[in-house]
Amino acid sequence: MGRGRVELKRIENKINRQVTFSKRRNGLLKKAYELSVLCDAEVALIIFSSRGKLYEFGSAGTTKTLERYQRVCYTPQDNNMECETQSWYQEVSKLKAKYESLQRTQRHLLGEDLGPLSVKELQNLEKQLEGALAQARQRKTQMMIEQMEDLRRKERQLGDLNKQLKLKLEAEGQSLKAIQGSWNPSTATAGNSSFPVHPSQSNPMDCEPEPILQIGYHHYVPAEGPSVSKSMAGESNFIQGWVL
């Protein structure tokens, strides 16, 4: 009669757990030895009991197998880091060379360090300068045209604003004239005859003097000669006439 299937869970009985550990440990160590002998494999087995006791097996030595394991696991990562470092170094070298080339080209464009250049290189440099000059002139012309268009647009806006202000001023002038006409006496007399208005004199000095009534008073100023008697006679006649 065969044994039943063992349920995989922690054995609660301490004695049974220790017995099972001893049996399974010995069997595992035996299987590791058989695998190394039968298959010519390098096998390393490390076991720690629940009490911390170490059990190990190594066909070529546990330490040697662990060192080999570390080399296999960590060497590819080191190789990747080395490859990445090499790639960055090459990239930095390319950027440095490009930077130096740009600096050299800038000096040539400024007319510096032209001695080492050949005739062909000088011709290419001349073409580059001519092209750059043409582009600069074209850009300058374009900017001037844009500025002129902007000034024309502002001029049109100011002209329209001036026209609007002129029309507004004319309208206000017409309104002011209408108000002045409504308050003009001649216009008011012509418009409404039921309310006669006497025209005012523009200059008070132009008005004729009103007659002065003299009652019982005469300012006499004595004078010499015959004019005195004549004047007195005239004044006497004036008084007598008024009394009568």
Curated annotation (Swiss-Prot):
Residues 85-175 form the K-box domain. Expressed in flowers and seeds. Transmembrane segments: none annotated. Residues 180-206 are annotated as: Disordered. It comes from the Eukaryota. It comes from Vitis vinifera (Grape). This is Agamous-like MADS-box protein MADS3. GO terms for biological process: flower development; positive regulation of transcription by RNA polymerase II. SUPFAM superfamilies: SRF-like. Residues 1-61 form the MADS-box domain. Pfam families: K-box, SRF-TF. GO terms for molecular function: DNA-binding transcription factor activity; protein dimerization activity; RNA polymerase II transcription regulatory region sequence-specific DNA binding. InterPro entries: MADS-box/MEF2_TF, MEF2-like_N, TF_Kbox, TF_MADSbox, TF_MADSbox_sf. GO terms for cellular component: nucleus. It is found in: Nucleus. Gene3D superfamilies: Transcription factor, MADS-box. Probable transcription factor involved in flower development. Residues 181-204 have a biased composition (Polar residues). Keywords: DNA-binding, Flowering, Nucleus, Transcription, Transcription regulation.
